[in-house]
Amino acid sequence: MIKVKICGLKRDEDIKCVNRYKPDYVGFVFSKSKRQVNLEQAKMLIANLDSSIKSVGVFVDEALEYVYNTSKILALDVIQFHGLEDEEYMRHFNEFTIWKALKVRCREDILNLNYKYADGIVLDNKTAGSGKCFDWDIARHIKIKKDLILAGGINEENVETAAYIVNPDIVDVSSGVESQGYKDSSKIKMFIEKVRNIK
């Protein structure tokens, strides 16, 4: 079964919503973004998060010590690196589950991956959180020895097609479950139901 990550939670209402509809993962963005949260905000949100839902911290080219301390304080389940973090950087986080984002341009980008310290690879377009897809055919039925997380422009209307083409382990949605810049409870409900019904 394909798992679901809802990314970019900021408000108490967002937590109440995901606690009700139970995605597998939720993401908290610590890099500069309209969805950015700070440590104190994240601490309060995670404190109210259902224990069955795993927390993911999203970081972009942050200082190593900041990422490590934030991840320890919040007891994050997953650290997602979305910048230019290399193997030397990622090896300092081997006590955590690590996802590394790849801005997909061609199939070789995926096949030539050699992220020793990453447990999962996030396939995204060049501009994360933009709501735009990359060409999924590039990743058609690709096989890697890590969790494959598909992001970038996914929503309730196209997630079935995306799942059929790429066959990911996890789908990662942010703007695809928003209305006017905020997480939309009905869209989250419909998205999760749609993914749970994919055969």
Curated annotation (Swiss-Prot):
InterPro entries: Aldolase_TIM (IPR013785), PRAI_dom (IPR001240), RibuloseP-bd_barrel (IPR011060), TrpF_fam (IPR044643)
Superkingdom of origin: Bacteria
Keywords: Amino-acid biosynthesis, Aromatic amino acid biosynthesis, Isomerase, Tryptophan biosynthesis
Reaction catalysed by this enzyme: N-(5-phospho-beta-D-ribosyl)anthranilate = 1-(2-carboxyphenylamino)-1-deoxy-D-ribulose 5-phosphate
Leading EC class: isomerase
Gene3D superfamilies assigned: Aldolase class I
Pathway recorded for this protein: Amino-acid biosynthesis; L-tryptophan biosynthesis; L-tryptophan from chorismate: step 3/5
One Pfam family cited in the UniProt record for this chain: PRAI
Gene Ontology molecular functions: phosphoribosylanthranilate isomerase activity
GO biological process: L-tryptophan biosynthetic process
Enzyme Commission number(s): 5.3.1.24
Disulphide connectivity of cysteines: none
CDD domains: PRAI
UniProt record similarity statement: Belongs to the TrpF family.
HAMAP family assigned to the protein according to its UniProt record, in alphabetical order: PRAI (MF_00135)
UniProt name for this protein: N-(5'-phosphoribosyl)anthranilate isomerase
Taxonomic source organism: Clostridium kluyveri (strain ATCC 8527 / DSM 555 / NBRC 12016 / NCIMB 10680 / K1)
